[in-house]
Design a protein with these regions (language model features):
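Conserved, mostly hydrophobic/aromatic
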Residues: 6, 18, 36, 51, ...
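Beta/alpha (TIM)-barrel catalytic core signal, keyed to glycine-rich beta->alpha loops juxtaposed to Asp/Glu
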Residues: 134-320
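Short, acidic/polar
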Residues: 30-43, 106-121, 168-177
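Acidic (Asp/Glu)-rich catalytic clusters
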Residues: 10, 69-75, 120-123, 153, ...
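Active-site groove signature of glycoside hydrolases
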Residues: 119-138
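N-terminal binding-site loop/beta-alpha segment at the start of enzyme catalytic domains
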Residues: 1-78
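A short, structured active-site edge motif that brings together acidic residues
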Residues: 77-89
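Active-site mouth loops of central-metabolism enzymes
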Residues: 22-34, 96-109, 138
């Protein structure tokens, strides 16, 4: 396992992290808590030190599982990054889970309360990183979310402040970095072989301001692992029913076929490993957070850290306009 500093102010982290959305038990198909915990232990055994979760993943369940493993193995030098802003506590009609429909909530009071609830679930006195969870751009024009992060830092309840960036214009994303460069320590960015917009403007700005980059969706919801085809169907509450519908699958798979030469260069590595290694090869990027529901998936992911760097020019991949 290789390690990098998360920007100029962030902690040192493993270049392959553990994305804990799937183990929350919602939106990714069936999961088993015992297997999920084994996956977390496998990550620790492989040298993973960076674990990314969110309060909304499984309505707190992802954080609960991480807390159980921390109790068993100790916190040590682990970096736990969570997120807040998708309010499942107060909104709408209650479901069987006891929570209502999720709504964005970036009011100062709510974010502070959400951070305190995450601290309690995780069994920690301070959060290593708290990230605003993919807010719409208009929410980021408010003072509330930034005041909340500032206060939580001052109170010692969080060590570092981050932003998981939603899909809006690169120029607007870069402006946020400039505007909040003194507060933001890291950003989480959608970046993979088929989605490379961030290279144009956002990554240079992140380097300029010393803001660390966490690579999210590095395998495009599993598509870049090579295990899906045009006939793939996602069932039930699996979010990929919408994020990888038939039309998107066709488009993405067509782009993947044009990159066959890339995979042939690395015959000893899986498509998933090639995708992951690409994501952490850019100098702006410190850590990638693939999901892993089983120990086997985790071990495959972690092996990508020790691959040679994969640097591509725009014509060689799906650099989007």
């Amino acid at each position: 396992m290789q390690y990098k500093n998360l920007g100029a102010r962030g902690p040192r982290v493993s270049t392959i992290g553990f994305g804990a959305w799937a183990i929350g038990g919602m939106n990714w198909g069936p999961t088993d808590d015992d297997v999920s915990k084994k996956a977390l232990h496998a990550a620790l055994d492989a040298g993973v030190t960076f674990f990314d979760t969110a309060d909304v993943y499984g309505f707190g369940h992802s954080e609960d599982l991480i807390a159980e493993v921390i109790k068993e193995r100790g916190k040590g030098d682990l970096i736990i990054a969570t997120k807040a802003g998708n309010d499942f506590y107060h909104a709408g009609k209650e479901s069987d889970s006891g929570y209502g429909a999720i709504q964005q909530n970036y009011k100062k009071k709510y974010l502070i309360e959400a951070a305190e609830k995450s601290l309690k679930r995780l069994g920690l006195e301070t959060l290593d990183i708290l990230q605003l969870h993919s807010p719409d751009l208009e929410k980021l024009e408010w003072d509330d979310p930034w005041e909340a992060l500032t206060l939580l830092k001052e109170q010692g309840k969080i060590q570092h402040a981050g932003l998981s960036i939603q899909s809006f214009k690169e120029s607007e994303q870069a402006h946020l970095l400039e505007r909040h460069k003194g507060l933001l320590d890291c950003i989480q960015v959608r970046y993979n072989l088929l989605e490379r917009k961030a290279e144009k403007l956002l990554f240079p700005e992140a380097i300029k301001y010393g803001v660390g980059v966490i690579v999210r969706i590095p395998m495009l919801f599993g598509l870049l692992s090579g295990k899906f085809n045009r006939q793939s169907i996602f069932e039930g509450d699996d979010h990929r029913r919408f994020n990888l519908d038939a039309e998107k699958l066709k488009s993405y798979l067509g782009k993947m076929e044009s990159m066959s030469d890339l995979y042939e260069r690395y015959p000893d590595f899986s498509p998933a490993q090639v995708a992951l290694r690409f994501g952490i090869s850019h100098p702006a990027c410190s850590v990638s957070i693939p999901g892993g529901k089983t120990p086997a998936q985790v071990n495959e992911n972690c092996a990508a850290s020790d691959m040679p760097a994969i640097i591509l020019h725009p014509p060689e991949s799906g650099l989007d306009d």
